[in-house]
Regions:
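A short glycine-rich, Lys/Arg-flanked "PGG" loop and its adjoining helix->strand segment in the class I
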Residues: 204-216
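A short SAM/SAH-binding and catalytic strip from SAM-dependent methyltransferases
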Residues: 187-201
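Class I SAM-dependent methyltransferase core
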Residues: 127
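Structural signature of beta-strand start/N-cap positions in the alpha/beta core
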Residues: 124, 147, 185-187
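Class I (Rossmann-like) S-adenosyl-L-methionine-dependent methyltransferase catalytic domain
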Residues: 11-121, 131-178, 200-205, 221-314
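Basic polycationic patches enriched in arginine
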Residues: 5-6
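A short acidic, Gly/Pro-enriched loop at the edge of an enzyme's catalytic core
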Residues: 179-189
C-alpha cells in the first residue's frame, strides 16, 4: 500500500483478558477434567485434543469439548452445547460444535474491567445485535444473578435463541429505533461488530438510541473497523489494494468510510444503511462527546482486526 502509513498496534492480552473463562473453569474440579481427558484419549481423534499451552486457551477448549462430550458433568458451568442449525445465523458455524464464544465474552468483561467496572447482581445488560446469542449465553453462564437481554433484527436467529437459551430475554428488534426498552434500563450495552456495518447516518442514530436506554454513567462497549482493519483485510482476506487505498484516503479525510458490500436478500435485512464501515477515534471524539465520555480505545483488540471502544453515558 502506498502513501502514508500509520503504525498499527494490537493491545496485549493479560490475565484480565480471561476473566469469564476463569470464572467458568473454576466451577470444575480435577475429577471433571480427568474424566474428559480419559474420554478424549479413548476416542483417539486428533480433532478433539486439549492444547497444553497457553493455559487460558487450554481452559477454553476444555470447556468447549467438555460441554459437548460430557454434558452431564460439565453442565455445572451453566454452558450448553446447543447450536443453531445451518440455516440460522450463527457466526460460529465454522465450528462443528461450540458453547458460545468465550473469546468475546472475555473481551467484553475485560473492557469493563479496564474501565473500572464489574458485572453486578440484579443489574440489566444488553447484547445489541446478539444474533443467536453466541456472546450473551456465555455471560449468562458466568453471571447468572444478573439480568441478560439480547436483540437482533434477524428473526430466525432470535426465534432459535428464545427456544434454546432459557433465562435470557431475547427480542426481534427493528433495524430502526426505537428499541422496546425503558430509558436508563441497562448498566451496560455491548455490540460486537455492529458499528462495523452502519452507514454514518445509522451509526449516529443508533448511538443516540443506545444512550437513551443506558443508565447515567453506564457503559457502551462496541467493536468496529478502523485503519487496522483495512490492513487486516488487505493482508488476510485479499481486499484489493485499490479498494484499501480508496477507503483509507476517505477514512483519513473524514474519519468515517462506508462501503456497500452485501447482496440483496442478506438474511432478509434492509441493506440501505447496512454494509461495511470504518471509523477513526477522531470521528468518535468529534461526533459523540456531547452525550458520551470515551473511557477506552484498543486498536485491533477484536481478533487482531476490529478496534474496541468503551463509552460512558454522561
Amino acid at each position: 500500500m502506498g502513501g502514508t502509513r500509520r503504525q498499527l498496534l494490537t493491545s496485549p492480552q493479560s490475565e484480565q483478558s480471561f476473566i469469564v473463562t476463569n470464572i467458568l473453569f473454576s466451577k470444575l474440579n480435577g475429577n471433571d477434567i480427568e474424566s474428559l481427558e480419559k474420554l478424549l484419549k479413548e476416542m483417539s481423534d486428533s480433532r478433539f485434543t486439549i492444547p497444553d499451552f497457553p493455559p487460558e486457551h487450554s481452559k477454553r477448549e476444555t470447556l468447549r469439548l467438555g460441554n459437548y462430550f460430557l454434558p452431564q458433568v460439565f453442565n455445572k458451568t451453566g454452558l450448553t452445547s446447543k447450536v443453531p442449525p445451518s440455516n440460522v445465523h450463527d457466526l460460529l458455524n465454522h465450528l462443528e460444535f461450540h458453547c458460545g464464544t468465550l473469546y468475546y465474552a472475555d473481551l467484553v468483561i475485560e473492557a469493563m474491567f479496564r474501565s473500572g467496572r464489574n458485572i453486578k447482581k440484579n443489574k440489566s445488560y444488553l447484547d445489541f445485535g446478539s444474533s443467536s446469542g453466541r456472546v450473551v449465553r456465555v455471560l449468562k453462564a458466568a453471571y447468572p444473578e444478573s439480568n441478560w437481554f439480547g436483540c437482533d433484527p434477524i428473526t430466525e436467529a432470535i426465534e432459535w435463541a428464545k427456544e434454546n437459551l432459557p433465562g435470557i430475554n431475547f427480542y426481534n428488534s427493528s433495524q430502526i429505533p426505537p428499541l422496546p426498552y425503558n430509558d436508563n434500563q441497562f448498566a451496560m450495552v455491548f455490540a460486537i461488530s455492529i458499528w462495523s456495518h452502519f452507514s454514518e447516518k445509522a451509526a449516529i442514530t443508533w448511538f443516540k438510541e443506545i444512550n437513551r436506554i443506558i443508565e447515567p454513567t453506564g457503559l457502551l462497549i462496541f467493536s468496529t473497523h478502523g485503519l487496522n482493519s483495512l490492513q487486516y483485510y488487505y493482508q488476510n482476506d485479499g481486499k484489493p489494494e485499490t479498494e484499501v487505498q480508496k477507503a483509507g484516503e476517505t477514512l483519513l479525510e473524514t474519519g468515517f468510510c462506508y462501503e456497500d458490500v452485501f447482496k440483496p436478500g442478506h438474511y432478509g435485512l434492509d441493506l440501505s444503511d447496512w454494509g461495511n464501515c470504518y471509523i477513526l477515534p477522531e470521528w468518535i471524539l468529534g461526533n459523540l462527546l456531547c452525550d458520551w465520555k470515551l473511557l477506552l480505545y484498543q486498536v485491533g483488540r477484536a481478533d487482531l482486526n476490529q478496534d474496541v471502544y468503551v463509552l460512558e453515558k454522561k
